[in-house]
């Protein structure tokens, strides 16, 4: 059996090819890998360090196995973070997705329940009255009509359930933590992706290149999986097959450095109140700045190159309260 060969390769500390990795993860989501085998394989991958081929193979397998989403022909993007930064901030990427859509961008936001913070994207949106389990057809209609869809990971990646007991028992990060942001079932070719460690910038950029993604901006902001208001943000930008590495500071967006403490979040209900106030034009300077900086880079994925002008536009949109209208419309689907 081919799986035996794959296990032998892993346990000899050798890397899998992209095809072998795809075959292994196909077997995982089909429930064909015993928990003991999966546990051993995940640890073998982790200790050696997952290669770009292994990550890309896993992504390909998981996207093929996912429940279908009717992806549109027009350009659209995803904005997502790895989580795991331990900072417990408000849901900046979810707020940025809503604001971006209110400015005319098309955003299919992939998200899940919280893993390490108190409030994940789906926890927050549920609290705000959004049907996170809406059908793929309804989500696509929302994307067409209001520029925003929420693509709930658990609904589309049903095969993940086979890995849950092992992941919970291992209590450590595995390749599954890396895969989450890469497996949007809508197959977004553009993405703003926040990572919990600067060491992940290069592998994510290289994996997105291997997967022929059009334009990805991968960020790590001084300890956050977001663009930072409190310090430097390291960036890996993939465009047309080329990867560029650079740093951004709040000044590049027209802002001063602000303390991170003022972005602390809480339980879902608490975060929902904060995000509602923010979208209605009642956010604090720090909250507005965080969303403006992240949305400014989201706009860059659609050809708006001047991030300072983008940030100004976002601040004006927040002050107007129009972003809240987009959220209200989303609750109707």
From Swiss-Prot:
The lineage of its organism: Bacteria, Pseudomonadati, Pseudomonadota, Gammaproteobacteria, Pasteurellales. Pfam families: Glycos_trans_3N (PF02885), Glycos_transf_3 (PF00591). This is Anthranilate phosphoribosyltransferase. Mg(2+) 2 binds at residues 225-226. SUPFAM superfamilies: Nucleoside phosphorylase/phosphoribosyltransferase catalytic domain, Nucleoside phosphorylase/phosphoribosyltransferase N-terminal domain. It is an enzyme of class 2 (transferase). Anthranilate 2 binds at residue 167. Mg(2+) 1 binds at residues 93, 226. One of its GO terms (biological process) is L-tryptophan biosynthetic process. Binds 2 magnesium ions per monomer. Belongs to the anthranilate phosphoribosyltransferase family.
């Amino acid at each position: 059996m081919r799986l035996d060969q794959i296990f032998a390769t892993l346990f000899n500390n050798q890397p899998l090819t992209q095809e072998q990795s795809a075959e292994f993860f196909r077997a995982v989501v089909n429930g064909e890998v015993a928990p003991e085998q999966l546990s051993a394989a995940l640890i073998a991958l982790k200790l050696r360090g997952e290669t770009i081929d292994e990550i890309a193979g896993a992504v390909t397998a998981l996207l093929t196995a996912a429940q279908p989403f009717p992806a549109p022909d027009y350009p659209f993007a995803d904005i997502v973070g790895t989580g795991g930064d331990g900072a417990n901030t408000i849901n900046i990427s979810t707020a940025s997705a809503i604001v971006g859509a209110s400015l005319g961008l098309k955003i299919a936001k992939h998200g899940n329940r919280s893993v390490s913070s108190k409030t994940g994207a789906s926890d927050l949106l549920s609290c705000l009255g959004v049907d996170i389990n809406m059908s793929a057809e309804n989500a696509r209609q929302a994307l067409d009509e209001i520029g925003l869809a929420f693509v709930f990971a658990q609904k589309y990646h049903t095969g993940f359930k086979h890995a849950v007991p092992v992941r919970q028992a291992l209590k450590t990060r595995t390749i599954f933590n890396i895969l989450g942001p890469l497996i949007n079932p809508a197959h977004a070719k553009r993405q703003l992706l926040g990572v919990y460690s600067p060491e992940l910038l290069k592998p994510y950029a290289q994996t997105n290149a291997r997967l022929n993604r059009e334009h990805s901006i991968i960020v790590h902001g001084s300890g956050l999986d977001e663009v930072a208001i409190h310090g430097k943000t390291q960036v890996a930008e993939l465009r047309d097959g080329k990867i560029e590495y650079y740093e951004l500071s709040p000044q590049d967006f027209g802002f001063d450095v602000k303390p991170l403490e003022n972005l602390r979040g809480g339980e879902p209900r608490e975060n929902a109140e904060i995000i509602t106030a923010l979208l209605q034009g009642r956010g604090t300077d720090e909250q507005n700045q965080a969303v403006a900086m992240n949305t400014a880079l989201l706009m860059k994925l659609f050809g708006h190159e001047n991030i300072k002008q983008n940030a100004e536009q976002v601040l004006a949109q927040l002050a107007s309260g129009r972003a809240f209208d987009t959220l209200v419309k989303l609750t109707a689907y």
